């Protein structure tokens, strides 16, 4: 597994210098870190805007894919808050405990400041799903403003389209509007 370089702190510092109002700052090669003081720490390079499917612990370490758990995309902002973030954090913490047997698998606020997630639709309410989509669309505009690579934008747009298609039938109007906007 190749290492991401430079380090996350350097990326954040560089991005903040370039942007006067860094509400959302994307950085290339950010390390997604899951783990904590238990000694279990998994670092995985996440290219800018790329959707990463987190699977079983061993396969995450080996960079392989087998069991779908959740989808994460990397952004630089305040640690997640609200019901969706709590659900995501608890889900990952429990998942790490199950896979490793560790008693404490909390990644800590500093690490969560680099990770923002979207849980699969069956774990989220319609309003939360639409809010997540709004966040992703806002991120897309931010990436354009920051001059992100076309590949990074393409990856994020694919994630947005996939999320739109997962909306329930009750959101048919929103689906139509969002898909029309993305064309």
Swiss-Prot record:
One of its GO terms (biological process) is symbiont-mediated suppression of host innate immune response. Keywords: Host nucleus, Host-virus interaction, Inhibition of host innate immune response by virus, Viral immunoevasion. It is found in: Host nucleus. GO terms for cellular component: host cell nucleus. May play a role in inhibition of the host immune system by counteracting the type I interferon response. This is Protein P7. It comes from Infectious salmon anemia virus (isolate Atlantic salmon/Norway/810/9/99). The lineage of its organism: Viruses, Riboviria, Orthornavirae, Negarnaviricota, Polyploviricotina.
């Amino acid at each position: 597994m190749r290492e991401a370089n430079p380090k996350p702190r350097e990326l954040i510092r560089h991005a903040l210098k370039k942007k006067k109002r860094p509400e959302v700052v994307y950085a290339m090669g950010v390390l997604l870190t899951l783990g904590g003081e238990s000694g279990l720490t998994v670092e995985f390079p996440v290219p800018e805007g790329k959707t990463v499917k987190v699977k079983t612990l061993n396969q995450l370490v080996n960079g392989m894919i087998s069991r779908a758990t959740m989808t994460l995309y990397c952004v630089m902002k305040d640690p997640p808050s609200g019901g969706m973030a709590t659900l995501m954090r608890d889900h990952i913490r429990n998942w790490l405990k199950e896979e490793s047997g560790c008693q404490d698998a909390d990644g800590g606020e500093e690490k969560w400041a680099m990770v923002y997630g979207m849980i699969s639709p069956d774990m989220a309410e319609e309003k939360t799903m639409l809010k997540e989509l709004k966040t992703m669309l806002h991120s897309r505009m931010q990436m354009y403003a920051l001059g992100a690579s076309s590949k990074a934008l393409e990856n994020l747009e694919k994630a947005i389209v996939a999320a739109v298609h997962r909306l329930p039938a009750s959101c048919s109007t929103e689906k139509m509007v969002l898909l029309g906007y993305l064309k």
